[in-house]
Amino acid sequence: MMVSIDGKIEGYFADAPLTGACGDYYEEVIPKLGDAHGTGSYTACLYMAQADVDYDGFKDTPVEDGDFIVKNEEGKYLFVFDRHGKCNWDDAFSGGMQIVEVLTRTVRKEYLAYLRSKNISYIFAGENDLEPELSLEKMKAYFGIHT
């Protein structure tokens, strides 16, 4: 991952000579640095979550209220802060880490049904906006995250 001085993750600097090597190193090291990694929906959608999803196929699927937790024996998690449910994943893992979507209650039920069909965990951390304290409490309670 490369970041410009103004915090952008894409732009002209992406063509710099060492960008490829730095990106490869980042992908190799991140899973080794702790039991969890966090990213925003923009980054996830740009680099990882680009599957084609037909949400119409999920409109009649019943979805239980509440968080959906899938345990991971490896204990490595990628928390994606995706308050509106925009990330379309191919499967439940990215870079060897299990994906956990951190959502708000504004997410449509078709998206929740899709996540469940892929065995992708999700937690609700706010009504309209994400509440950092609530998301951290749930990360610790459900997944044992301390980093």
Language-model regions, residue ranges each:
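Active-site ligand-binding patch in enzyme domains
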Residues: V3-I5, Y12-M139
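Short, intrinsically disordered, charge-balanced linker/junction segments flanking boundaries
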Residues: E137-T147
